[in-house]
Amino acid sequence: MANDKGDISKDGVSRRKFLGGAVIGAAAAAGVGSQILSLSATAQGADKERVGPLQSNVDYDAVVIGGGFAGVTAARELSRSGLKTLVLEGRSRLGGRTFTSKLDGEKVELGGTWVHWTQPNVWTEVMHYGLEIEETVGLASPETVIWVTDNQVKRAPAAEAFEIFGAACTEYYKEAHNIYPRPFDPFFAKKALQEMDGLSASEYLNKLSLTREQKDMMDSWLSGNGHNYPETIAYSEIMRWFALSNFNMPTMFDSIARYKIKSGTVSLLEAMVAESDMEVQLSTPVLKVKQDSHRVLITTEEGTIAASAVVMAVPLNTMGDVEYSPRLSDAKSEIASQGHAGKGVKGYIRIKQDVGNVMTYAPARNDVTPFTSVFTDHVGENGTLLIAFSADPKLVDINDSKAVEKALHPLLPGVEVTSSYGYDWNLDPFSKGTWCTYRPGQTTRYLTELQKREGRLFFAGSDMANGWRGFIDGAIESGREVGYQVASYLKGKNSNA
């Protein structure tokens, strides 16, 4: 079994120790509150009167393993279909790789944050629940850009810097329409995708006749998109984000880092759960999933649950931590072993000074700063709140304010850091990474296979979405589709019984 004895996982943290508090985590270290949506470990919703499952030999029609946006969406769709549904979540909260928390009493998003109308699934939900939107100003509309090239720091008005960067982007993205003419249908131009999918983001960059300055700015951008070093990121992944943004750079800036939910991503989760009669059980890691032709048995440390179908809605990098019987397909096992590339750092930094709306670029490897990008979230009474990214968590401890201040000084000389805060998703045994970024070759080799059901076992998640993979939108896309598939499957089975 995977970690059923509290064994140490390959990243050095067991799931049992994580839940037991041996890993303090960023929230405790920074002295801030955890995510608002934290239900009791008993099944939320279990006190409601409900019709029993369709089959007499099971406890639930469907069990959803994983309580991120994909899992919650799938569970909502299943419960809407009249199916008795349980969500099992290993953490003590819902939300997956989204995490609404606080820094100095102010709301921050430690994981997934931004939404946009180019992301139709999440935008529909935001509008449906009447949630308000606010803006992050620094990335999409900076006044000043600071960049590192050849280990030298440059500074210029945004318009001047974007002339350099924009010309590089025009060259880099020139194949995007050929690869993804219909970006929500990733294999529509399958031959073109296959020809380019094996390239890394850095390999393609090195093919281009750009200046050193342009390549350094692009390296920063690629690292920020993929949350790792560019050689680990598939070139096709970079093209996908651009295609989904209507093949337009200003729209891409707005789509990936401008608009966010004013009340936090947690408020969208709360609304989705409230509209459903799903049951939710937290702090319940799943150890084993065993299926036969009649039902699925899910084993946790608390016992065994029987269901007619199971939705695996866990991050790709944790898929292999559950024991499956029969074992998963070779393709799923292979990519679960490889993992996706998203492994970087995201953090919030509060400084005393008002530095205005700034944006910084630095290649993932440089001698100046560990931050590939830093930009203004907003300027307030207590100074400026910045959002910072790094390709490698080994380069900077985002929760060490002194280290963060030292890393900022080459970019913003003299600033005083009063607090800094981030969450190491790599140490979290229920994520083992940040947002999903496919490695070279993984899209064409594994995406279709990841989406295939295996018997009574279905698979959902942002990590296997067709469109905005790695975003909240992709999670909702996948969860909705799989919820519909499972409902159709179960009702079809029942009607034919």
UniProtKB/Swiss-Prot annotation:
Sites where the protein binds FAD = 70, 89, 97, 114, 286, 462, 472
| Domain of life according to the entry | Bacteria
Q: Which UniProt keywords apply?
A: Alkaloid metabolism, FAD, Flavoprotein, Oxidoreductase, Periplasm, Signal
UniProt xrefs under InterPro entries: Amino_oxidase (IPR002937), FAD/NAD-bd_sf (IPR036188), Flavin_amine_oxidase (IPR001613), Flavin_MAO (IPR050703), TAT_signal (IPR006311)
Q: Which SUPFAM superfamilies does the record match to this protein?
A: FAD/NAD(P)-binding domain
Report the SS bond pairs.
none
What is its cofactor?
A: FAD
Catalytic activities: pseudooxynicotine + 2 Fe(III)-[cytochrome c] + H2O = 4-oxo-4-(pyridin-3-yl)butanal + methylamine + 2 Fe(II)-[cytochrome c] + 2 H(+)
Provide the cofactor note recorded for this chain's UniProt entry.
Binds 1 FAD per subunit.
Q: Where in the cell is it found?
A: Periplasm
Q: How does activity depend on temperature?
A: Optimum temperature is 35 degrees Celsius.
Q: What's the main place this protein lives?
A: periplasm
Q: How is it modified after translation?
A: Predicted to be exported by the Tat system. The position of the signal peptide cleavage has not been experimentally proven.
Q: How is activity affected by pH? A: Optimum pH is 8.0.
Tell me, what is one Gene Ontology molecular-function annotation carried by this entry? oxidoreductase activity, acting on the CH-NH2 group of donors, oxygen as acceptor
Q: Which residues form the signal peptide?
A: 1-43
Activity regulation (UniProt): Strongly inhibited by Ag(+), Co(2+), Cu(2+) and Hg(2+).
Keyword presence, Signal: yes
Q: Which family does it belong to?
A: Belongs to the flavin monoamine oxidase family.
Q: What is this protein called?
A: Pseudooxynicotine dehydrogenase
- Species name: Pseudomonas sp
Which gene name belongs to this protein? pao
